[in-house]
Amino acid sequence: MGRRKSKRKPPPKRKNIEPLDQQFNCPFCNHEKSCEVKMDKSRNTAKITCRVCLEDFQTGINFLSEPIDVYNDWVDACETAN
């Protein structure tokens, strides 16, 4: 006599982790991927600059900060200024 067939579910598939962007769209000139973030974790500062319109923004960071956080701070500062 044979065993009954197992009805156990297969293990869930792992999702691929996609890396976060390092270059962003400029909120001033609207060029795609023209803004680049430079982070200096030893000084706890980050600077984002646009290569096309030469706009820049500098902000303070902590050890958990990522380039997307600097970009979001820049966009938030633009919205509060307007």
Curated annotation (Swiss-Prot):
The lineage of its organism: Eukaryota, Metazoa, Ecdysozoa, Arthropoda, Hexapoda. It is found in: Nucleus. GO terms for biological process: transcription elongation by RNA polymerase II. Keywords: Metal-binding, Nucleus, Transcription, Transcription regulation, Zinc, Zinc-finger. Zn(2+) binds at C26, C29, C50, C53. InterPro entries: Elf1, T_Elf1_sf. It comes from Drosophila melanogaster. Coiled coil: none annotated. Belongs to the ELOF1 family. GO terms for cellular component: transcription elongation factor complex. Its main location: nucleus. This is Transcription elongation factor 1 homolog.
